């Protein structure tokens, strides 16, 4: 049976008015009087609902339909009629309604506002609410926009491994992958676990980043990007941290930090524009019900040239600020969210790239600057959030990279293949990482990362 999507009715109304159509979806609300009733139907194709009018004289099963519970799945036949004086532009006058699957009266999503905290406990049902219908449709659009941006520019999409033997960040906050008996693992003479008896004959973890593997492909294809899940065993129970999240990580060869920042700015503006143009109903909803400054903020971003400031200059600005910070401002300390927001919201009033951070607070693979104290790193800070993108020019000089790895106590043998890139045709190259969920939070105004990923994995929580 061919059904018409509600999205098609809204986008091409004139093609359907006065015609008999069939729609299928789920009941959001139902109300009735003695001889007629109204159903708000959502079919998943569009943010807005379709109103269905049903009358006793037309439906043999009128009483059964009038008693439908919210959440029931139905198929409705009828004529689409314009309603210029009403809230909705049109409605379906039903001639037949079939119950595909009834919902029980204890359906958790009744017609009232539910807190986001409560909806997290029923994450399998929350996509049926207005807010999460909008969030996850925008998530889908943004994922497509990211691929579209890079594909239009000739980038090669690389699938990097989920299971890895290396730590891209050198931070050690990784989830171990093992088939060993955790109650009685084999041990070496010194008492440590003998991972040579494990599935991969070595210690392995879930990836924290696809960057290192991505770099290998940029040395062959020049411009590449990865887009996949990453995992951090970081015990941070905050609104901005999750143990499982998605990262967008491009790598560009024959490129320096300036090229990297230009790419990051172009990409962020592109995906915001794409969302504004292709999800107007959802974005209007977010602006009305989540953050009433959202559209102004996003339009300001796409129309502004991003500011640039070095880390040292940023520290100087912050140390002279008339605002008291919870975390001390000191050269050598990483910037905290309060510092980042002060720079973007009070000083520059737009997105800002902070560059040239102290080497001691950045990863081993970042290119050492001539001052031997800072590295060619950049963070993109945006108003309302703080850091949204982090990137750097990579260290292409073998001796510099080896020295840095020794300083940090990293095992050369674990990164032999990464060091090979510096032996065989090394070139300047750069890249960055965009936390996909943080981008969604920024573009929708949602304030908690748990509300922009379908089934969040956080400290003490792996339900569903």
Curated annotation (Swiss-Prot):
Protein name: Asparagine--tRNA ligase
Keywords: Aminoacyl-tRNA synthetase, ATP-binding, Cytoplasm, Ligase, Nucleotide-binding, Protein biosynthesis
A single GO cellular-component term on record: cytoplasm
Gene Ontology biological process terms, A to Z: asparaginyl-tRNA aminoacylation
Phylogenetic placement of the source organism: Bacteria, Bacillati, Bacillota, Clostridia, Eubacteriales
Localization annotation: Cytoplasm
Top-level taxon of origin: Bacteria
Species: Acetivibrio thermocellus (strain ATCC 27405 / DSM 1237 / JCM 9322 / NBRC 103400 / NCIMB 10682 / NRRL B-4536 / VPI 7372) (Clostridium thermocellum)
The family this protein is said to belong to: Belongs to the class-II aminoacyl-tRNA synthetase family.
Subunit structure: Homodimer.
Entry-linked InterPro entries: Aa-tRNA-synt_II, aa-tRNA-synth_II, aa-tRNA-synth_II/BPL/LPL, Asn-tRNA-ligase, Asp/Asn-tRNA-synth_IIb, NA-bd_OB-fold, NA-bd_OB_tRNA
The enzyme's E.C. designation: 6.1.1.22
